[in-house]
Curated annotation (Swiss-Prot):
Superkingdom of source: Bacteria
Catalytic activity, reaction form: 2'-deoxyribonucleotide-(2'-deoxyribose 5'-phosphate)-2'-deoxyribonucleotide-DNA = a 3'-end 2'-deoxyribonucleotide-(2,3-dehydro-2,3-deoxyribose 5'-phosphate)-DNA + a 5'-end 5'-phospho-2'-deoxyribonucleoside-DNA + H(+)
Pfam hit, one: Fapy_DNA_glyco
Protein name: Endonuclease 8
Active site: 2 (schiff-base intermediate with dna), 3 (proton donor), 53 (proton donor), 253 (proton donor)
């Protein structure tokens, strides 16, 4: 499943394609959304927002399209008139004079009015977004030490969107390696230095991934500016201590870690 950085980059691409342009055609696959098609013709997308792994497409008439890609959903940007060759099932089409955005395969799609943005079950439950520039390490530390989260193992906590939105498995793995902790640790058992390091890593690593993953530094042998230190690297030596990276399963997801420096 795409994690926060990937969802945010998708939102950036959608915004760049159609933001501010009048919609010339709108189509929804689901019957409950059909009535909104005519309401959106002539309107425009004002901005595309992310809340963790959910995407909110805001329109100029105050409607908002909520979509969650889950495992299979994917957005595509095409030139208007182009019909991609794909076996995926089209769910949403938002067309302007020159660009069209298409949502395939997703099933969690709703149209929301302004008052519903605060009452929608997922949006109401989700925690602060790690890519929100206003979210600080101090706030993250407060959440880590709150009665709700302080006694939970990181294996599950770092996948819980109610704790921090936008984290997922590769970020969980990379963050815990960065701070030298395991999935079995809990916030209540950490010292001040460990808490501080974790609070910073929970924001810095997702933001670095968003800003640089997929970009290339030609002066570096490994190429990509963001690269995995342990994720999908079982059997390889840890670059920090030289021990062999291992793979196990935690909270029903693959977990990669270094037994030499994560303890």
């Amino acid at each position: 499943m795409p994690e926060g950085p990937e969802i945010r980059r998708a939102a950036d691409n959608l915004e760049a394609a159609i933001k501010g342009k009048p919609l010339t055609d709108v189509w929804f696959a689901f019957p409950q959304l059909k009535t909104y098609q005519s309401q959106l013709i002539g309107q425009h997308v004002t901005h595309v927002e992310t809340r963790g792994k959910a995407l909110l497409t805001h329109f100029s008439n105050d409607l908002t399209l909520y979509s969650h890609n889950q495992l299979y959903g994917v957005w595509r940007v095409v030139d208007t008139g182009e019909e991609p060759q794909t076996t995926r099932v089209l769910r949403v089409k938002l067309q302007t004079a020159d660009k069209t955005i298409l949502l395939y395969s997703a099933s969690d799609i709703e149209m929301l009015r302004p008052e519903q943005l605060t009452t929608h079950p997922f949006l109401q439950r989700v925690g602060p977004d790690v890519l929100d520039p206003n979210l600080t390490p101090e706030v993250v530390k407060e959440r880590l030490l709150s009665p709700r989260f302080r006694n939970r193992q990181f294996a599950g906590l770092l996948l819980d969107q109610a704790f921090l939105a936008g984290l997922g498995n590769y970020l969980r793995v990379e963050i815990l390696w960065q701070v030298g902790l395991t999935g079995n640790h809990k916030a209540k058992d950490l010292n001040a230095a460990q808490l501080d390091a974790l609070a910073h890593a929970l924001l810095e690593i997702p933001r670095f991934s968003y800003a640089t993953r997929g970009q290339v530094d030609e002066n570096k042998h490994h190429g990509a500016l963001f690269r995995f230190k342990v994720f999908h690297r079982d059997g390889e030596p840890c670059e920090r201590c030289g021990s062999i990276i291992e793979k196990t399963t935690l909270s029903s997801r693959p977990f990669y870690w270094c037994p030499g420096c994560q303890h």
